[in-house]
Amino acid sequence: MAHQAHAYHMVDPSPWPLTGAIGALFLTSGLAIWFHFQSVTLLTLGLILLLLTMYQWWRDIIREGTFQGHHTPPVQKGLRYGMILFITSEVFFFLGFFWAFYHSSLAPTPELGGCWPPTGITPLDPFEVPLLNTAVLLASGVTVTWAHHSLMEGARKQAIQALALTIILGVYFTALQAMEYYEAPFTIADGVYGSTFFVATGFHGLHVIIGSSFLAVCLLRQIQYHFTSEHHFGFEAAAWYWHFVDVVWLFLYVSIYWWGS
């Protein structure tokens, strides 16, 4: 490796952004094909390609940051700014869904019966599964903070336990959400109520799955002694992301489940 007289990481050429983009294209196109033609071939191909890309890209970043020492303090600072900007872009992404929901619900058109929820829609009880989901997600926010503090204090076993607990709570939330979708008395095709409900809560559910995988990678890395109390940006980024998912759910619960019902 050539000697460099600066603290910045000159990233080597990598195929993963391209394979990741192709995987995402196949996944979204496959989803549309599955909805309309009941064929899961392209969807499965996209999912496999995306999972392989994730595995190999994560592997490369772990090699560069943990074993080759490329993640110097200035590089970590850049990664922090990058994560903050990414979460900010996600805030605006969800803002669009809330805008659609409030636009439709605050001034319901005569076609909807002039009321909200629209005529013929039976909304879900906000004090049943949605309230349990809120408790589960808030508890996972506590456990991820416990994991972070344990990591900073060098309490390795506690960090592993807290991380494992957070992932279990994330999986439990996803299972409850899937059950709620299965038993919902309305579908995504039931006008503006169905579409805003399922798109907003569905994208949030997708973010919970992404966050759970992010934390699962952190758990594996913590088990393999990759993190130290000073050097654990991968975990920090996962924790920020998880707290963001937490806060979005609180807004979804108050807006769509409680006020919207």
From Swiss-Prot:
<feature type="topological domain" description="Mitochondrial intermembrane">
    <location>
        <begin position="184"/>
        <end position="190"/>
    </location>
</feature>
<feature type="topological domain" description="Mitochondrial matrix">
    <location>
        <begin position="224"/>
        <end position="232"/>
    </location>
</feature>
<dbReference type="Pfam" id="PF00510">
    <property type="entry name" value="COX3"/>
</dbReference>
<feature type="topological domain" description="Mitochondrial intermembrane">
    <location>
        <begin position="106"/>
        <end position="128"/>
    </location>
</feature>
<dbReference type="InterPro" id="IPR035973">
    <property type="entry name" value="Cyt_c_oxidase_su3-like_sf"/>
</dbReference>
<feature type="transmembrane region" description="Helical; Name=V">
    <location>
        <begin position="156"/>
        <end position="183"/>
    </location>
</feature>
<feature type="topological domain" description="Mitochondrial matrix">
    <location>
        <begin position="67"/>
        <end position="72"/>
    </location>
</feature>
<feature type="transmembrane region" description="Helical; Name=VII">
    <location>
        <begin position="233"/>
        <end position="256"/>
    </location>
</feature>
<keyword id="KW-0472">Membrane</keyword>
<comment type="subunit">
    <text>Component of the cytochrome c oxidase (complex IV, CIV), a multisubunit enzyme composed of 14 subunits. The complex is composed of a catalytic core of 3 subunits MT-CO1, MT-CO2 and MT-CO3, encoded in the mitochondrial DNA, and 11 supernumerary subunits COX4I, COX5A, COX5B, COX6A, COX6B, COX6C, COX7A, COX7B, COX7C, COX8 and NDUFA4, which are encoded in the nuclear genome.</text>
</comment>
<dbReference type="GO" id="GO:0006123">
    <property type="term" value="P:mitochondrial electron transport, cytochrome c to oxygen"/>
</dbReference>
<dbReference type="GO" id="GO:0004129">
    <property type="term" value="F:cytochrome-c oxidase activity"/>
</dbReference>
<dbReference type="InterPro" id="IPR024791">
    <property type="entry name" value="Cyt_c/ubiquinol_Oxase_su3"/>
</dbReference>
<dbReference type="GO" id="GO:0045277">
    <property type="term" value="C:respiratory chain complex IV"/>
</dbReference>
<feature type="topological domain" description="Mitochondrial intermembrane">
    <location>
        <begin position="257"/>
        <end position="261"/>
    </location>
</feature>
<dbReference type="InterPro" id="IPR013833">
    <property type="entry name" value="Cyt_c_oxidase_su3_a-hlx"/>
</dbReference>
<comment type="function">
    <text>Component of the cytochrome c oxidase, the last enzyme in the mitochondrial electron transport chain which drives oxidative phosphorylation. The respiratory chain contains 3 multisubunit complexes succinate dehydrogenase (complex II, CII), ubiquinol-cytochrome c oxidoreductase (cytochrome b-c1 complex, complex III, CIII) and cytochrome c oxidase (complex IV, CIV), that cooperate to transfer electrons derived from NADH and succinate to molecular oxygen, creating an electrochemical gradient over the inner membrane that drives transmembrane transport and the ATP synthase.</text>
</comment>
<comment type="similarity">
    <text>Belongs to the cytochrome c oxidase subunit 3 family.</text>
</comment>
<feature type="topological domain" description="Mitochondrial intermembrane">
    <location>
        <begin position="35"/>
        <end position="40"/>
    </location>
</feature>
<feature type="transmembrane region" description="Helical; Name=II">
    <location>
        <begin position="41"/>
        <end position="66"/>
    </location>
</feature>
<keyword id="KW-0812">Transmembrane</keyword>
<feature type="transmembrane region" description="Helical; Name=IV">
    <location>
        <begin position="129"/>
        <end position="152"/>
    </location>
</feature>
<dbReference type="GO" id="GO:0005743">
    <property type="term" value="C:mitochondrial inner membrane"/>
</dbReference>
<feature type="topological domain" description="Mitochondrial matrix">
    <location>
        <begin position="153"/>
        <end position="155"/>
    </location>
</feature>
<feature type="topological domain" description="Mitochondrial matrix">
    <location>
        <begin position="1"/>
        <end position="15"/>
    </location>
</feature>
<keyword id="KW-0496">Mitochondrion</keyword>
<feature type="transmembrane region" description="Helical; Name=I">
    <location>
        <begin position="16"/>
        <end position="34"/>
    </location>
</feature>
<feature type="transmembrane region" description="Helical; Name=III">
    <location>
        <begin position="73"/>
        <end position="105"/>
    </location>
</feature>
<dbReference type="InterPro" id="IPR000298">
    <property type="entry name" value="Cyt_c_oxidase-like_su3"/>
</dbReference>
<keyword id="KW-0999">Mitochondrion inner membrane</keyword>
<dbReference type="InterPro" id="IPR033945">
    <property type="entry name" value="Cyt_c_oxase_su3_dom"/>
</dbReference>
<protein>
    <recommendedName>
        <fullName>Cytochrome c oxidase subunit 3</fullName>
        <ecNumber>7.1.1.9</ecNumber>
    </recommendedName>
</protein>
<keyword id="KW-1133">Transmembrane helix</keyword>
<feature type="transmembrane region" description="Helical; Name=VI">
    <location>
        <begin position="191"/>
        <end position="223"/>
    </location>
</feature>
<keyword id="KW-1278">Translocase</keyword>
